[in-house]
A protein has these predicted regions:
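Rossmann-like adenosine-cofactor binding region
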Residues: 267-366, 371
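Glycine-rich phosphate/diphosphate-binding loop of Rossmann-like nucleotide-binding domains
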Residues: 203-312
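Glycine/serine-rich phosphate-binding loop and adjoining beta1-alpha1 elements at the start
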Residues: 117-232
């Protein structure tokens, strides 16, 4: 599979310990494939077993979450927290609440988080958590009881200087609030143990917008430096209609682009006149409705069942912001055929390895998730800083810091790729830049894990 015998041994070890965990194995394979030149140039990595250690979580916590529904019936879900790597700082990563959550998904997300967090330049390690609980269709009371039960166990394993979870799919401001309240109740301390908190109890301005805004700052810098171009006058397709998609749409529009499509798990809407974001926010953030309602309210907009069709829409820039592996090889080929010039990932691993190969072999600019969507965790780390100082920055201050971080992530990835004769391969560059910092810290600390 790899040219390096060492990398093949490492991957075979992962396969033996994690059989059938396809998402995790895919993530490991993608990262290891980028590290061939780094391993060849640095024999200390093999001598000190750095790769064997970095692909194995420092700690995996699986637990039962029992809660009572509105009918008085006891329900049981499984909770997860994978503390993957703390070489450069406390574990940091979101909590995903979705029926698709399993050990493989959480491990893949935690593994990716190591490199994403490293790329921000901030002192945060990699971790991830979640549960197969589905908040959709649940009452506020049911969600509160689930979150309290979940945090009762999770609280034993986290802390402001140990592990700082955040939101993710299914975990928004409401869920973070319920979890924070339960942690405070159990520990009798007010501390920055979670990020994504409300502004009245330690949250940060611009956190809600951060992942979507950061995605566009990264993409704008990529277009500027590699194509001498920008969002201005470009047609943009954004998948998803959650937090990341909404604020990517907002920032892309502010930068001069025209977003013509959004989606959810049922289908997608196409508006050739440009998505009207106020309507989307009303449907998704206020009413918690489905994206098909957009077509019912806006003249000229069309709704189509199924999510995959969104990638058949002609566009200059594609921003997948929905979920993992949403762009497969077939969809990638259609995007290329229709003239896409840049793809940047707002979701975690939304493109399959085959799709990425199509983009790269076709000369399409490709911004990988671990770099392009790092704005959320970067601003979470800025929230941690504000909590430590007992101080709050203004929206513009946080936004300016976010933009600087995203611009630096692009350049660090670009330069790392160039260093190993992989110029233009931002995926390899992001993996290398993120890995080198973590590996150096691991070597300096000895065999601590």
């Amino acid at each position: 599979m790899f040219k390096s015998e060492y990398l093949n041994r490492v991957y075979e070890g992962v396969e033996k310990r994690s059989p059938g965990e396809k998402e995790f194995l895919q993530a490991v394979r993608e990262v290891l494939g980028s590290l061939e030149p780094v391993v060849a140039a640095n024999p200390k990595l093999e001598e000190n077993g750095v790769l064997e250690r970095i692909v194995e979580p420092e700690r995996q916590i699986f637990f039962r979450v029992s809660w009572v529904d509105d009918n008085g019936k006891v329900q049981v879900n499984r909770g997860y927290r994978v503390q993957f790597n703390s070489a450069i700082g406390p574990y940091k990563g979101g909590i995903r609440l979705h029926p698709s959550v399993n050990a493989s998904v959480i491990k893949f997300l935690g593994f990716e988080q190591i490199f994403k967090n490293s790329l921000t330049g901030l002192p945060i390690g990699g971790g991830k958590g979640g549960s197969d609980f589905d908040p959709k269709g649940k009452s506020d009371g049911e969600i509160m009881r689930f979150c309290q039960s979940f945090m009762t166990e999770l609280s034993k394993h986290i802390g402001a200087d140990t592990d700082v979870p955040a939101g993710d799919i299914g975990t928004g401001a409401r869920e973070i609030g319920y979890m924070f309240g339960q942690y405070k109740r159990l520990r009798n301390e007010f501390t920055g143990v979670l990020t994504g908190k409300g502004l009245t109890y330690g949250g940060s301005l611009a956190r809600t917008e951060a992942t979507g805004y950061g995605l566009c700052y990264y993409t704008e810098e990529m277009l500027k430096c590699m194509k001498n171009d920008s969002f201005k006058g470009k047609t943009v397709v954004v998948s998803g209609s959650g937090n990341v998609a909404i604020y990517a749409t907002e920032k892309a529009t502010q930068l001069g682009g025209k977003v013509v499509a959004l989606s959810d798990s049922n289908g997608y809407v196409y508006d050739p006149n440009g998505i009207k974001l106020d309507v989307v926010k009303q449907i998704k953030e206020v009413e918690r409705g489905r994206i098909k309602e957009y077509a019912e309210r806006v003249d000229g907009a069309e709704y189509h069942e199924g999510c995959k069709g969104i990638w058949t829409i002609k566009c200059d820039i594609a921003l997948p912001c929905a979920t993992q592996n949403e762009i497969d090889e077939e969809s990638a080929k259609i995007l290329v055929k229709n003239g896409v010039m840049a793809v940047a990932e707002g979701a975690n691993m939304p493109s399959t390895l085959e799709a990425i190969e199509v983009f790269q072999s076709s000369g399409i600019l490709f911004g990988p998730a671990k770099a392009a969507n790092a704005g959320g965790v970067a601003t979470s780390a800025l929230e941690m800083s504000q909590n430590s100082m007992r101080y709050s920055w203004t929206f513009d201050e946080v936004d300016a810091k976010l933009k600087d971080i995203m611009v630096n992530i692009f350049h660090n990835s670009y330069n790392a790729a160039k260093k190993y004769n992989l110029e233009g391969n931002l995926l390899a560059g992001a993996n290398v830049a993120g890995f080198e910092k973590v590996a150096e810290a691991m070597l300096a600390q000895g065999v601590a894990y």
